[in-house]
Amino acid sequence: MKIDLTGRTAVITGGSRGLGEAMAKALAESGARIALVARDVKRLEVVRDAIRKSGGTAEFFAGDVTREDDVARVAGEVKQRMGAAQILINNAGINIRKNLVDYTLAEFQSVMDASLTSTFLMCRAFVPGMKGTGYGRVINMSSIMGHVSLPGRTAYSSAKTALLGLTRALALELAAEAITVNCISPGPFGTEMNTAVMNNPETNAQFLAAVPAGRWGDVGEVGAMACYLCSEMAGFVTGTDILIDGGWTAR
């Protein structure tokens, strides 16, 4: 069954590259109008132009989603230029790989803010516009690091685990409004965040050995799941977390 998101406006943070870019393109192919949000204007222009070249509709809104004033400004600009948003995908995030005792407070907080605080701010800004419409979709991007962890991921695992709790709580708050709230937790994907691991034969082999499927994930697989969760078919799916990890966490 073809997923049709025609007439829906989707706001995607971290939409300038990686999984955010993949989800933006997938939703655009399904007919959604895409509002890309990130700090890198040059990359935003590239993704916007690629979507338009493929026949989709996309605009970009440069801003720092960890800043309350930037989120308020972006929300106003999206509403003015594209109307109310029915879909919100919170994909922004960073990772600083250090052991706990080596973090500065600023470094730890920056990782938490990029994933968790930004999600709070974006939901607070955009969810009210979904209420009373009979349809709304929020997808928060967690990670398998919210379920398991590795050395040097203290801040990242903390942020991604917290997102699971936020998602469940918000899903309960919004269920009666026909607004679904779910997480996607990707495993190892071939994005820029993992370039160093992939380009090192030793670490690449170690990662692949941990994945029962024996390969890196394709970003299109996350895009497809995002489309499903945004569709009418997923109206009864809320408060849950979808692991896309090639069996990593099933071991």
Language-model features and meaning:
Residues 99-100, 107-112, 207:
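Substrate-binding pocket helix/loop in short-chain dehydrogenase/reductase
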Residues 123, 159, 167:
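Active-site helix of classical SDR
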Residues 41-42, 62-73, 105, 219-220:
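The beta1-alpha1 cofactor-binding region of Rossmann-like NAD(H)/NADP(H)-dependent oxidoreductases
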Residues 128, 172-176, 235:
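Alpha-helical segment proximal to the catalytic Tyr-Lys
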Residues 143:
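Residue(s) in the substrate-gating loop at a strand-loop-helix junction
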Residues 120, 135, 179, 215-244, ...:
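C-terminal substrate-recognition "lid" of short-chain dehydrogenase/reductases
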Residues 9, 16-17:
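Conserved glycine-rich cofactor-binding loop
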